[in-house]
Amino acid sequence: MESQLQSIFEEMVKTEIIEEAFAGMFMDTPEDERTKLISCLGAFRQYWSVLPQESHEQCVQWIVKFIHGQHSPKRISFLYDCLAMAVETGLLPPRMVCEALINSDSLEWERTQLWILTFKLIRKIIGGVDYKGVRDLLKVILEKIQTVPDTVSSAVVQQLLAAREVVAYILERNACLLPAYLAVTEVLKLYPEGKLPHWLLGDLVSDFVDSFRPTARIGSICGRCSLLPVVNNSGAICNSWKLDPLTLRFPLKGLLPYDKDLFEPQTALLRYVLEQPYSRDMVCNMLGLNKQHKQRCPVLEDQLVDLVVYAMERSETEEKYDDGGTSQLLWQHLSSQLIFFVLFQFASFPHMVLSLHQKLAGRGLIKGRDHLMWVLLQFISGSIQKNALADFLPVMKLFDLLYPEKECIPVPDITKPQSTHSFAMTCIWIHLNRKAQNDNSKLQIPIPHSLKLHHEFLQQSLRNKSLQMTDYKIALLCNAYSTNSECFTLPMGVLVETIYGNGNVNIPLPGSNCMASGSITPLPMNLLDSLTVHAKMSLIHSIATRVIKMAQAKSTFALAPALVETYSRLLVYMEIESLGIKGFISQLLPTVFKSHAWGILHTLLEMFSYRMHHIQPHYRVQLLSHLHSLAGVPQTNQNQLHLCVESTALRLITALGSSEVQPQFTRFLSDPKTVLSAESEELNRALILTIARATHVTDFFTGSESIQGTWCKDILQTIISFTPHNWALHTLSCFPAPLQAFFKQNNVPQESRFNLKKNVEEEYRKWKSMTNENDIITHFSLQGSPPLFLCLLWKMLLETDQINQIGYRVLERIGARALVAHVRTFADFLVYEFSTSAGGQQLNKCIEMLNDMVWKYNIVTLDRLILCLAMRSHEGNEAQVCYFIIQLLLLKPNDFRNRVSDFVKENSPEHWLQNDWHTKHMNYHKKYPEKLYFEGLAEQVNPPVQIQPQYLPIYFGNVCLRFLPVFDIVIHRFLELIPVSKSLETLLDHLGGLYKFHDRPVTYLYNTLHYYEMQLRDRTNLKRKLVHAIIGSLKDNRPQGWCLSDTYLKFGMNPRDDNPWIPDDTYYCKLIGRLVDTMAGKSPGPFPNCDWRFNEFPNPAAHALHVTCVELMALAVPGKDVGNALLNVVLKSQPLVPRENITAWMNAIGLIITALPEPYWIVLHDRIVNILNSPSLTSETEWVGYPFQLFDFTACHKAYSEMSCSYTLALAHAVWHHSSIGQLSLIPKFLPEVLIPIVKTEYQLLYVYHLIGPFLQRFQQERTRCMIEIGVAFYEMLLNVDQCSTHLSFMDPVCDFLYHMKYMFTGDSIKDQVEKIICNLRPALKLRLRHITHISTESAAPPPPPMNSGSPAPQPNQVPVSVPLTVTQ
């Protein structure tokens, strides 16, 4: 090939001798030149036509090499003309020629003539190259330009500019050689933000990059760096808060010149989240940290160190380290965070200690030194045995810095808990020394002189064999010697013996035949807080081992109350999770179950029901799954255990947080049976109500009509197959629409009341006619026989006032599990009986008999009967009768009211502060004994049956506490039926005090007001009553100002039907300000300090958000007005809102308004419509300017030139940033129905793009269907504007954004829809957008995966979408 080409091209450049002799004087005419070119190309054309396809590229490269080997500029010029003609006549492909030219090794800037001629040729033919080829050429050209040095002779600058002209042509917007979006990607790869472009390109490149700043802003959330989340315990995290784990930057889509602050590390965001108690799961989610992969995260390490330094600064200003003070809470939290992140190796202990030393050096911060050493001791004592001594030695460097004393530090008062912190450094030294001895290390660390007195005191205490619990000496010894088993056994032995009891004294527990070991006083929280994590782990391990041993030994004695209470308290420490709650759920429970130790199982379930706080949702759902499998085991078919299992399951189901339901149940989609009850209709109904509430509060179903394709479809279908049932219309009407549709489709035929009555009469006739006792017992207790026996007992009592002994025997034989079905039927039968009752005397008799069945004969417990009644699906009048029965059962006799009032009066919900719970518990049970084995009936039958049932130990529970989750359900049922409102008020008046013991009273109130917003809109008195009853029940146990604002308590709590209180702007500003101050960590904060470990909410911000929402929903003001008032806090000029902090206020409004029902936040859509219709966006003559300045909130705000459109834009972004995907999914509906018809101008179009552009990423990740609808709507809107405008000034930013959308989000998924729209646009737009659809027709090859993280698994309501095209294509 080479020889043929050689001869062809040498022939081309052959000249006569005379021409060479007079080279500068001979000149061809243009005609001669052309003739020569054509004749020369003829020979080549012939050769090219027979050349195989695969040799084309090699051939072109040889030609270029041949040309570049020439030395005569004239010859090169002639050959380049030949190449140009070959391209123009279609002989050679332009892309191949350009690539060969630019990639030639001979093309160097020093050969200026060749450089000029080459780039002129490229400029001439590049127009024929496809856009992908142009992109590749741009990349190589930019790299080639990089080879030009920073300093060159001015003589050659002109020649070098030929390359610049080619770049200018490629970047020329009107030429449209390639999407400008792809060009800027290449430019920014070579010259990222902050790096200057090559001097040859200078302003050309920087101006081009600047032209993309509007596109970058369209894709950015206003004030994003100031937006902060509220940390919840659920671990659920929205993609909005993800950060790069190496740089802490936001993961921005596409290479665009985003605002500088978006490229900065978001240390403030991570620091804020780290400061929040119970935030570790969110931190892991934000940074993508996985516990299974031990990966050090230096940025996290730095923030932890900074947080410790901040705590040291705080300690310097605080007068004293008081119990429950801000400083104590901060150090407590820091200790927990440090252990977690260092334990899972996300942070390195020695690195952190050295970094701390560096940051504290020369600062003189020593007031907090003991607390710092206490935090370090936590980790050292627990891990020094498994790690090298060298890892811990940097602590001694820190000691030298923080303990400069020359004299001995005196021994502190050891009756105070903080004395354990004062001893922390001495304890560290003892552990280090012990490690050095064990490792036979030559390195001996002498005791520092300043710690001598402390050390001597510990040595002396160790010699004292009779340690008392009156001071903190035991804790000190445990902390100092936890790695020295000889010394540790004594103090730990004292602690253990204190709570186990010595075995000589036994005490009775409630019920008959139940005795426990005699220790009743638990270890106080102050003492447990004073133990290191290592000591706590030893203690909890010892307790768990003891429990397992007792379970396996089938011990006749129950666990000591002190042990059970202490174990509960230890489970609150997140630092010991592996031995704590994880061991409890995955090791202890299964072992106890396997050993058939039903007493201990009952104890563990009681602990979980009444003593556990902030348990992660996956543990709770795991326990629920255990309970459902337990329910089917024959041994659990025992009255007390069955009641406990069902009661615990009910609590677990109803207590699930709205944001927890979907993530947790999605884990069981492959086998939903494990989290559902195979036989309990009530538990399955409770789960459906929880799903309805969760999907309503999170707006999961917003915009959906069906549950098809969603996570709850299989769950609902399995429930219907397990326990077929219907819902009353008044309950169903509150469900989200897709759930309503499901239950209407899956309607279950119900037995008529008439049939029920007939069957009961028939069975009763059988009862009266049968004479053989065994036959009667067999017939009525037979599995599969109609569950009507309680109806028969009722009839017996009505007719004869007594039940005979056979009745008792049948009940005993039926068994606890089967009896539930009888209670269900009995509930329906009662409604029938009361509905047909003549009233008066007969009604009183019915009520009396019903109460006797509960309190006198102990046939069914009150909580079980009320739950069954509340869960039936009666309609209309029958529903009212059902609720009437519930009210009578709860209030008519004094039995339950007395129990409630005495329990509320005598007890406190703050169990962690009590040491006499057991005494009060026993006193209550002596006064109101629980009878769970039909004892009353056994005594009353003739002849009486002597029974002494074996009770399982009861440590915490009673009928009042068991009734609380049932009461939650009862209130909801009463709210659904308007005619029974007054009855509900009466119930709240008499029993509302029970909410003092509710573990989540504010959450319950929040969920209730949110879910029933529509039902409560016009029932302001009932709303007020509900809030008053629940919040008022806690007044004696909460400090002033813990929940509702003073203004609301003063004006909102007073019923004024004629003239309801309408709050003013000041009220809303103060309410928002309270959340702003809380999130800013203001000290003292708006809310009183508390121990968050035992609080309903995990941290101050979560508490502030929920109480604020409760108060706003409780106002006697329509949701729409409240929503507008909240928006006005920043959209109107408010003297109480500081300008410099405006984004923090917008953040707070976003958090609050998105946590409220739809009527509150939907008003934002009206504000957007008002802005779009405002003169500044509809009339181009209204003002002369650049719309991107108008929409730049930050710049406008700083320049005091803000306009309502930029404020509304920033506020909308804050609201939508905090919105759930359900709330955001109204946008695709809002666009075509409301916005498209009104968008007529470019400014309006750009405003809508600015509004919605930043959220395309959320839609892509969480609901692709919505992203596709929005993508199409953007083009339809552009068509509208195009047809309504004579001139378009901002075509380039609009098109750049549409390309950004294509390459980063939609890919080819909307190609077909938008192709038709693009065809109808004006030529200039059509030219710019031609690559949007042209790209896929030109290349049939499938696109590679996106360069950013891929889209997650398809979510509900998603449709298949082609993978977004990457800008690397």
Swiss-Prot record:
Annotated Pfam families: Med23 (PF11573)
Subcellular location per the Swiss-Prot or TrEMBL entry: Nucleus
Example of a GO biological process term: positive regulation of gene expression
Pro residues biased stretches: 1341-1357
Cellular-component GO terms for this entry: mediator complex; transcription regulator complex
Record key words, sorted: Activator, Nucleus, Transcription, Transcription regulation
Region (Disordered): 1337-1369
Function: Component of the Mediator complex, a coactivator involved in the regulated transcription of nearly all RNA polymerase II-dependent genes. Mediator functions as a bridge to convey information from gene-specific regulatory proteins to the basal RNA polymerase II transcription machinery. Mediator is recruited to promoters by direct interactions with regulatory proteins and serves as a scaffold for the assembly of a functional preinitiation complex with RNA polymerase II and the general transcription factors.
Family: Belongs to the Mediator complex subunit 23 family.
Summary of subunit composition and partner proteins: Component of the Mediator complex.
Protein name as annotated: Mediator of RNA polymerase II transcription subunit 23
Gene responsible for this protein: med23
